[in-house]
Amino acid sequence: MLRHQSNYQILDLVGQGQFGRVFAAVELKSGALVALKELKTKQLSTSSFLRELTFLVTLDHFNLVTCKALEHGYNQRYIVMDYCEGGTLRSFLNNSPAISLNQSLKLVIDILSGLKYAHEKGIIHRDIKPENILLKTSDRSYTAHIADFGIAKLKQEIDSQNILGNTGSPAYMAPEQFYGEYSYNCDLYGVGIILYELVTGNRPFSGMPKELVAAHLSQPVTISADVPLLLRLAISKSLEKLPSRRYQTAAEML
């Protein structure tokens, strides 16, 4: 709950992030729509809260959900963020009967553009999936914006320590992530899964977590011949089992 003296009024619950609920709200002074990400003190450590806040305030790119302010409530803290009226890419995939190839490619280009910027800042997102991609509407089309940097890590931190704990979502994780190994192309592997899902309507692998682990580690990716050849090649390269055989940078995949 917000304080009585708050600068914002909550309108509705619009989503659930990894570390808290997300509300649509209005800034009382300007009337602008914003998103408030609730971070409950008892559910989120100060270090985790400060980590995401630090990443958000230092990142400034059109295809990243950025931080506008910090708001305090009763036993809660809120990050004030860009409002993305199109919802999540997951909802879009679930509710859209068909997504054009052009729209699919545009969304992936948006995601890669945001990752290129984040990677240049030394940040690996580590949890690229449709639930963490928010959409804005623009000229009868959609633009994609990467959200939820809650488990992101600086490359220099990953190089200097063994990363355990929250590591991502099994359906979108690169094989080496299951062993606690990360690089920039782990994020690109997740983009490859999203691209596959956009153009085929399904993920390349499905099942329970243990089945997903086995599939990512050893099962070949099959792509319908209906998918254009150049796109099949791009998907195949992004989903190689060995990191060295994948795209090494977002710029290369672009």
Where are these regions (language model features)?
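Activation segment signature within eukaryotic-like protein kinase domains
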Residues: 107-108
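Protein kinase glycine-rich loop
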Residues: 11-17, 22
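C-terminal lobe helix-coil module of Hanks-type protein kinase domains
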Residues: 171-254
